[in-house]
Amino acid sequence: MNYRRFGRTGWMVSELGYGMWGLASWTGSSDAESRQSLQRAVDLGCNFFDTAWHYGSGHSEQLLGELVRRNPGRKLYLATKIPPKNFAWPARPEFSLDDCFPPEHIEQYVRASVVNLGLESVDLIQFHSWSDTWLEDDRWVKKINDLRQQGLFQAVGISINRWEPRNGTRAVMSGLIDSVQVMYNVFDQNPEDELFPACTAQDVGVIARCPLDQGSLTGTLTLASKWPEGDWRNKHFNRATLKASVERANALKALVPPGMTLAQMALRFILNSPIVSTTIPGMRKVKNVEENLQIAGQGPLPGDLYRELRKHRWDRQAAR
């Protein structure tokens, strides 16, 4: 496993982290299987784990706390997120700080996450939605500073709205945050335009989320793909989105080198960017952990392949 510096925190985190959304929020998840997958990741050198209170109303956090206690001799970096008070994603321009992150709500969920983890402190607390308009209201800054001084967490970050990396650039340049979590993959390259240069300038850690584009960059989706009733993917992959995603993923398959999967190629594309501190694929099964972490230490993709993949940028806008 290779380790990268997590911005100004100085933490050395595994370039391949672990996204825990699917362990408590997706249909078909099993705690026993999740525990095995998490432990296998630790055994293979993964030391960065990203969860959130919203993932199973704290259940994903509880699984992560168990993992830490099973590995007392290893330093694992834990990142979790405060849900917006209105539980509405993405943050809309008309949402005020009181709608999403009033000070008392911030404190309530920071403390709830620490309790769920069963620890005295968490490494990174993130806002699970974000709007740069909230920079005008310093109440969140005062509350965050107060809770950090109490030792409840070490660093603070923001999770930026899907396909809106610009709506976080001001927060980065303010110097108030230590990290950003943003969609970045073969398709979603727009963080490179403004956000990544700002992160470089301010020495802010970068967490690349959705590295496999919610599953489309695994190459396993088809036009007939369906999910159980109530699964969030039914809404995300509506007919038009599924068709476009499958077509774009299929166009990449001819580029996959021998001995590599589409998912592995997609992950290595992300790691070609030196500003990325870690990327956090979701890995519910041990076989997924082993396949994804197999690329650790393999270095950047060949230049000609990387340049070809860059042509597959897909600029999208979230529906409002």
Question: What are these model-derived regions, one by one?
Answer:
Residues 86-100:
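Surface-exposed, active-site-proximal loop segments in enzymatic domains
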Residues 6, 18, 34, 49, ...:
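Conserved, mostly hydrophobic/aromatic
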Residues 29-41, 100-117, 162-171:
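Short, acidic/polar
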Residues 114-133:
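Active-site groove signature of glycoside hydrolases
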Residues 34, 60, 106, 110, ...:
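Aromatic/hydrophobic pocket-lining residues that form the small-molecule binding cavity
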Residues 1-76:
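N-terminal binding-site loop/beta-alpha segment at the start of enzyme catalytic domains
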Residues 74-87:
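A short, structured active-site edge motif that brings together acidic residues
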